[in-house]
């Protein structure tokens, strides 16, 4: 059993998600101690519990200590079963963070898996569903991940109520070299249970700033009913994306400009993937090998690298230049 210090680095929930995902995939039991030790509310939060329970169900794992507020758990995985599963995170817990946790493990399932996840689709401190679909998954496909994803209903803070469906097939992971893709900018601006002009103003402000900086873009408008009112915008070009969420007291124009500015920062760097995707791809480059560049190495990325190296006994290197190059020969 491998022991993981959950307080290492940024000491957040990502250590838990990555550890349990790689444990499930490899069959290696893990003990995680000091979970979120330095956070205002230490221990497992509800969405971490749901993620561990979901992987335990899919892999018929034995678990110890998996409950709200727990600072130490053990996870002893079994075989990863095919089938259909439902996971309700509750309120507006992030569906994309849970899928990030499930996806590496599901590549090694015995057969096709379909997971329906209910919770928050566009919430703070996590990728949006549009980012997952249009930026992260296409990059993961290059590593051999065979998965499709659709959002059936958006869910905003605080009630959530979003519904997404992830379908996977057994995948043979392979090394991938992610090159810079220079292509047009696309986007989706959306609002739920709010007037359509909210989404349109977000899009118009983003388009204006992008045009001012010399970029053309196409942004689709989506409106729908939702359990809680909310809005957001996601922009992308190749493997670089950005997003911003509306909130009470913030003008729609400011939301649009926030997303546009973040994407412009990524495009100017000439790196092949954005800062957040660099973090999300660590399990795949650790398993299969490959390389990509990013403009910055976040604390999340460094912590994820440390976690993957602890479990997989692989080596992931970072070369610093005008951009950072992350590369690995994998764990095979």
Curated annotation (Swiss-Prot):
Keywords: ATP-binding, Cytoplasm, Ligase, Nucleotide-binding. It catalyses: a 3'-end 3'-phospho-ribonucleotide-RNA + ATP = a 3'-end 2',3'-cyclophospho-ribonucleotide-RNA + AMP + diphosphate. InterPro entries: RNA3'-term_phos_cycl_insert, RNA3'_phos_cyclase_dom, RNA3'_phos_cyclase_dom_sf, RNA3'_term_phos_cyc, RNA3'_term_phos_cyc_type_1, RNA3'_term_phos_cycl-like_CS, RNA3'P_cycl/enolpyr_Trfase_a/b, RPTC_insert. GO terms for cellular component: cytoplasm. The active site is at residue 300. The keyword Iron-sulfur does not apply. Its EC number is 6.5.1.4. GO terms for biological process: RNA processing. ATP binds at residues 100, 276-280. GO terms for molecular function: ATP binding; RNA-3'-phosphate cyclase activity. This is RNA 3'-terminal phosphate cyclase. It comes from Methanothrix thermoacetophila (strain DSM 6194 / JCM 14653 / NBRC 101360 / PT). The gene is rtcA.
């Amino acid at each position: 059993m491998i022991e993981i210090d959950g307080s290492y680095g940024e000491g957040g929930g990502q250590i838990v998600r990555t550890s349990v995902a790689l444990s499930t995939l490899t069959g290696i039991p893990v003990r995680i101690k000091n979970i979120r030790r330095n956070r205002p509310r230490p221990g497992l939060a509800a969405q971490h519990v749901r993620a561990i329970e979901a992987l335990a169900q899919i892999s018929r794992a034995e678990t110890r200590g998996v409950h709200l507020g727990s600072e130490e758990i053990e996870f002893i995985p079994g075989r990863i079963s095919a089938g259909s599963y439902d996971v309700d995170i509750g309120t507006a817990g992030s569906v994309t963070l849970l899928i990030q946790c499930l996806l590496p493990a599901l590549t090694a399932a015995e057969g096709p898996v379909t997971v329906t996840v209910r919770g928050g689709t566009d919430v703070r401190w996590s990728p949006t569903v549009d980012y997952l679909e249009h930026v992260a998954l296409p990059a993961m496909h290059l590593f051999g991940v065979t998965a499709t994803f659709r959002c059936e209903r958006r869910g905003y803070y605080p009630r959530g109520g979003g519904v997404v469906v992830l379908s996977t097939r057994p995948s043979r992971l392979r090394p991938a070299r992610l090159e810079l893709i220079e292509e047009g900018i696309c986007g989706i601006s959306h609002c739920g249970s709010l007037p359509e002009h909210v989404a349109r103003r977000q899009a118009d402000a983003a388009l204006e700033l992008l045009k001012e900086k010399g970029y053309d873009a196409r942004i689709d408008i989506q409106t729908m009913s939702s359990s809680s009112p909310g809005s957001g915008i996601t922009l992308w070009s190749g493997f670089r994306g950005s997003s911003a969420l509306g909130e009470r007291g913030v003008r729609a124009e400011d939301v649009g400009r926030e997303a546009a500015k973040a994407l412009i920062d990524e495009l100017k760097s000439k790196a092949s993937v954005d800062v957040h995707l660099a973090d999300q791809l660590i399990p795949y480059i650790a398993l299969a090998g490959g390389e990509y560049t990013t403009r910055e190495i976040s604390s999340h990325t460094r912590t994820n690298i440390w976690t993957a190296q602890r479990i997989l006994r692989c080596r992931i290197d970072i070369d610093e230049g005008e951009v950072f190059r992350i590369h690995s020969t994998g764990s095979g």
